[in-house]
């Protein structure tokens, strides 16, 4: 059984027991969070597609960890002008473990 849900402006395809990295959520480590913006649920034979969301569909997950991703570098370079601008960014994320899918 798997589901597609929306969180942080992104869509994620998950199944039970899977660990997923999402955009940062305001929840403490160990908390249980519910996602109700479920776009699709499938159990092998039946496929339930929402318009836009599946009614009664929920994905439950447990917050495992918060952290920051790898650093990316942003460089703006102007040729022949002796001008260069460099900036770095590390995005916050929340790691969750999917504990249940309801359709």
Swiss-Prot record:
SUPFAM superfamilies: L21p-like. Pfam families: Ribosomal_L21p. Keywords: Ribonucleoprotein, Ribosomal protein, RNA-binding, rRNA-binding. One of its GO terms (biological process) is translation. GO terms for molecular function: rRNA binding; structural constituent of ribosome. InterPro entries: bL21-like, bL21-like_sf, Ribosomal_bL21, Ribosomal_bL21_CS. GO terms for cellular component: cytoplasm; ribonucleoprotein complex; ribosome. It comes from the Bacteria. HAMAP family: Ribosomal_bL21. Belongs to the bacterial ribosomal protein bL21 family. This protein binds to 23S rRNA in the presence of protein L20. NCBIfam families: L21. Part of the 50S ribosomal subunit. Contacts protein L20. This is Large ribosomal subunit protein bL21.
């Amino acid at each position: 059984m798997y589901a597609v849900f929306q969180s942080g402006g992104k869509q994620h395809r998950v199944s039970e027991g899977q660990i997923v990295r999402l955009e940062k959520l305001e929840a403490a480590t160990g908390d249980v969070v519910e996602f109700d913006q479920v776009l699709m649920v499938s159990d092998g034979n039946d496929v339930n597609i929402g318009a836009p969301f599946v009614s009664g569909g929920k994905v439950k997950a447990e917050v495992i960890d918060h952290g920051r991703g790898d650093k990316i570098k942003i460089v703006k370079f102007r040729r022949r002008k002796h001008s260069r601008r460099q900036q770095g960014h590390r995005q916050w994320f929340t790691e969750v473990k999917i504990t249940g899918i309801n359709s």
